[in-house]
Amino acid sequence: MAVGKNKRLSKGKKGLKKRTQDPFSRKDEYSVKAPSTFAIRDVGKTLVNRTTGLKNANDALKGRIFEVSLADLQNDEDHAFRKVKLRVDEVQGKNCLTNFHGLDFTSDKLRSLVRKWQTLIEANVTVKTTDDYLLRLFAIAFTKRRPNQIKKTTYAQSSQIRAIRKKMVEIIQREAGTRSLAQLTKLIPEVIGREIEKATHGIYPLQNVHIRKVKLLKSPKFDLGALLALHGESSTDDKGQKVEREFKETVLESV
């Protein structure tokens, strides 16, 4: 008789003795801080595996990119269709200090702008800021009806399109090339678009002129001092600073 395994014999199950560990018990929570150029600096929280052995939590956090609505950062719903990318450059305590990494439009906003009976004009420019950031800015514009126009269509001639595009490139180079990255992030949402609209009014009236996308091509060598200056020269939590200011004001009022 052949000797084999008796399958009917009950075996002890190995899996029962193992206890499942919650993966979140090994993680730490860090606050993500936006640069001081934005009105709201608390972006949110991010999770990372706790430092163990040679694996450092700070190294895992550096380089992370967060996409945030500009409406949340500026506390203004008019900017809801703009998305800002923030990159973690430094970790201090439980705070992740970020820097501007790019800007984009939501796809639904872009689709809502494109319509019939008008001309779409696009331009892209590669510029270097005064603090050596290499950026590529993409501009978009649409033709609109002149006052008292009867004709339904507002198509621009190819010569007019070339003239408008030339103006767009000139304005973007002038505005972006003479400013730092922090100053440029304030201008991108509204100011540059309005400048283009004013300058090209004589060629053909435009509407919905926007910088629809900003791409960061190259960053200068990392400078901790510059990053801390961008975050208000302090790595501590903003809440502490606000309480101190409020406390001083109440003392002055009571005196």
UniProtKB/Swiss-Prot annotation:
One of its GO terms (cellular component) is cytosolic small ribosomal subunit. Residues 1-18 have a biased composition (Basic residues). GO terms for biological process: translation. Residues 1-28 are annotated as: Disordered. The keyword Ribosomal protein applies. InterPro entries: Ribosomal_eS1, Ribosomal_eS1_CS, Ribosomal_eS1_euk. The keyword Zinc does not apply. Residues 19-28 have a biased composition (Basic and acidic residues). This is Small ribosomal subunit protein eS1. It comes from Paracoccidioides brasiliensis (strain Pb18). The gene is RPS1.
